[in-house]
Curated annotation (Swiss-Prot):
EC number: 1.1.1.408
Gene: pdxA2
Residues bound to a divalent metal cation: H170, H214, H270
The protein's name in its UniProt record: D-threonate 4-phosphate dehydrogenase
Cofactor binding notes: Binds 1 divalent metal cation per subunit.
PANTHER family attached to this UniProt entry: 4-HYDROXYTHREONINE-4-PHOSPHATE DEHYDROGENASE, D-THREONATE 4-PHOSPHATE DEHYDROGENASE
Amino acid sequence: MSDYLPVIGITMGDATGIGPEVIVKSLAHDSVRAQCRPLVIGDVRRLEVAGRLVGSPLKLRAIQAPEEARFQSGTIDCIDLGLIPEGLPFGKLSAVAGDAAFRYIERAVALTRDEKIDAICTAPLNKEALHAGGHKFPGHTEMLAYLTGTPEVSMMLVAPKLRVIHVTTHIGLLDAIRKIEPGLVQRTIERGHQTLQRAGIAAPRIGVCGINPHAGENGLFGHGEEEEKIIPAVEALRARGRDVEGPLPADTLFYRAGRGDFDLVVAMYHDQGHGPVKVLGLEAGVNITVGLPVIRTSVDHGTAFDIAGKGIADERSLLEALRQGAELATRRA
């Protein structure tokens, strides 16, 4: 592996949530600077407030471009967009914070396009605030696809002992079932396969969930969705030499994946994949957007308005997101 330390752009997320706190806490860990050169994209004054809340000894440096960053121990370099007014309360929905969260991502994408940073790691945003700020995206994943001009991406969640990629995400269950078709299933699995290979797994073992209980039980449950929507994709991939098994009942598949039988589980819809991951590792879970022209990792939790501003937010998910983002960027380099 290369000795290169990638520059990771950390977007601050929603300023009224726990994002500023977990960023300041994370960057106090020496392990982060051993893995990457962190560069926050957000608001210095908000990070200073968060630093006081958590008792951080780190100093903030406001800069306007990555070239100005020093990446010194004891200091946080922040590209300061200056969008958050002083005194904005924590834990309350804000259209200003929602718009700012979009602007941080927009700047991060521009910096990756200009090859000024090597990867993006995102703190959480609030979807309602994002919409109130005028940006009608379901979440980070769809926003990044739009900003990079990528027609199709996938969400992969990673937790201790489990990786899950989703065929569909932020749509209703009926819409998800209608959207699932062999081409989408096949492309999703291929994106997951390629991502795991880049992470060092030469021949990923992939298990594919069914849609119905018991994966349809040979047609007893549902209306033949497994036969129509999933099996053709699995057969096509197996013909190309991919190690793919399914469709399998989701409950037993996740059990088998947890004991190490599979490197990746393919979930058909949002809650099918999110539930098991969050049971196994909410604090250390990571969200990776697969299929973008840039590397993007994220915490696997929300803005936690109920505890925002109290200085008690857990930074472990961001630490893991930074570690995985740095690893992917280093392998690409």
